[in-house]
Structures are given as C-alpha cells and as structure tokens.
Amino acid sequence: MAHFVQGTSRMIAAESSTEHKECAEPSTRKNLMNSLEQKIRCLEKQRKELLEVNQQWDQQFRSMKELYERKVAELKTKLDAAERFLSTREKDPHQRQRKDDRQREDDRQRDLTRDRLQREEKEKERLNEELHELKEENKLLKGKNTLANKEKEHYECEIKRLNKALQDALNIKCSFSEDCLRKSRVEFCHEEMRTEMEVLKQQVQIYEEDFKKERSDRERLNQEKEELQQINETSQSQLNRLNSQIKACQMEKEKLEKQLKQMYCPPCNCGLVFHLQDPWVPTGPGAVQKQREHPPDYQWYALDQLPPDVQHKANGLSSVKKVHP
C-alpha cells in the first residue's frame, strides 16, 4: 500500500512538470488492468477445471461403490442358497458320503469367498482413503479458489482506490504552487545531507578506532620483537662464552694429559713397569720418612684415583669380603 501511495505521489510530481508523463499514465493503468484481468481469467479457468475433476472422481467412486455392493449381495445370496441346499441334503442318509464331499467343497468355496470378500473390503478401504485424499485436495483447492477470489476483490478495490486517488490528485494538482514544491525539495535535500553527514561521522569514528587499535597492536608486536631479540642476543653471548670455556677446558685437559705422559714413576712390587707419580706423595729430602710416619688416608679417594699398589690392596680386601661375608 505504501509503495502504491509513494508511486502515486511521484507520478503526480512528474505530471506537474511535463505533459508527456500525463499521456503515459493512462497506458500504464491500462496495462495494469489488462494484467489483472488475465490473472482473474486464469484463476477462473483453474477453478472450473478443479470442479470438473472433483465431479469426475465423485461419479467414479459412486459407480465403484454400487458395483461392490452388488457383488457382496450376490455372494451373500449364493451363500444362503448353498446353506439351504446343504440343509436339505443332510436329511438323506444314503448320500452322506457325497454330503461330506460337498461339505468340504462348500467349505473351500466359503474360504475362497471369504478371502475374496476380504480383498474387496481392503480395496474398498483403499478407495475410501483415496476418496478422503481427493476430498482433502478438493477442500484445499476450494480454499485456494476462495483466496483467489479474495485477492481478485482486493485487486479490484485497490484499482478503484487508485483510480479515485489518481482522479483526486489530477483534480488538486493545479492548486500546488511552484514555491511550495521548491521548498519541499530544498527541505528534503537538507534532510538527506544531514543524514549523510551523520553516516559519514559514524564511519570516520569507526575508521579512527580501527586505526588506533591497529597502531597499538603494531607497537605491542614491535616491543615483543625487541624483547625477543634481546633474549636471543643474551642467549647467543652465553652460548659463545660457554663454547670458549669448553675449548679452554679441552686445551687444559690436553695439556695435563701431555704432562702426565711425560711423568714416570720408579718400579714397585706391583709388577708394573711404569708408575704415575702420586700427586699426594711428597717429594724432596725427608719426604719418605714423613710418609711412613704419616701414611695418607685413602678412605676418601675413589678407587680409580688410588695408587696402583693401594688399588691392589683394596681389590684384595674386597675379594676377601666377598668370600667371607
């Protein structure tokens, strides 16, 4: 409705400015009327087709129902006749054997008839379900038809209203002056510009917030990068210092090994040709006498750090302890 009113107001404003649009308006209204009439005719045609289909289904269902009712009546008549025939045959004692055979045959026929009746009953139920579905579909189509009629009435009322509004607008369009129209246009332009300025202010504020956030994130990342670089430089300097210390220790070790290789000890009773000099054995005049008076305490030495003769003694004591625990 609002779109129609807005279109009408725009059409009125356009007609007041040029005569060409006044000539184009009746053709537009005529096209709208033609399209609505075509739609109404199409809906009427669909309604008639639906009514014809419903009538055909109703006639078919009634004919099938009458046919099955006649069949059921015929079968019941045959069943009654067979029962009467059997009751009369039972009175004759000489025909008992044939009566039994006939009874079995009748039972078989009765079973067949019952099965056929059950099948027909199922078929009847199926047809009833189809009829119910057709009724539901018919009801739905009737609802659609009612909706289409209401829509048709609504379109007709809307066309009448638009025609009336158009006629009223054509009648009162001469009363509007150019100053009023110009003033309304200027006010509309000012309002539109104010709205656009508000939107632009909001966009600028959003862009400014995004820029500040991005700048703070960039500064934080740069600070973290500098801290990591400092940590890396510190670690690298520590690694270089440790490498230099390791090299110095290796050189000192090689130097000590060379000095140890150049040192010889006098032969002893242990059977070894050469002896390394014990660093804890004092050298010089009177050192042997002092060593005998104060022998070194080897209980705090590791086994591989003891002199060879002390190692042999320690090994002997350990073997004795193993033998005599």
UniProtKB/Swiss-Prot annotation:
InterPro entries assigned: CC2-LZ_dom (IPR032419)
Induction of synthesis: By Listeria infection. Expression is slightly down-regulated by dexamethasone and slightly up-regulated by IL-10. Strongly induced mRNA and protein expression by lipopolysaccharide.
Bias kind Basic and acidic residues: ranges: 17-28
Ubiquitin-binding domain (UBD), as annotated region: 190-248
Record flagged with keyword Coiled coil: yes
Record field: transmembrane: none
Keywords: Coiled coil, Inflammatory response
GO biological process, one term: MyD88-independent toll-like receptor signaling pathway
Coiled-coil residue spans: 27-265
GO MF term (any one): polyubiquitin modification-dependent protein binding
Secretion signal, residue range per the UniProt entry: none
Subunit and interaction comment: Interacts with TNFAIP3. Interacts with polyubiquitin.
Function: Binds to zinc finger protein TNFAIP3 and inhibits NF-kappa-B activation induced by tumor necrosis factor, Toll-like receptor 4 (TLR4), interleukin-1 and 12-O-tetradecanoylphorbol-13-acetate. Overexpression inhibits NF-kappa-B-dependent gene expression in response to lipopolysaccharide at a level downstream of TRAF6 and upstream of IKBKB. NF-kappa-B inhibition is independent of TNFAIP3 binding.
Name of the molecule in the record: TNFAIP3-interacting protein 3
Organism: Homo sapiens
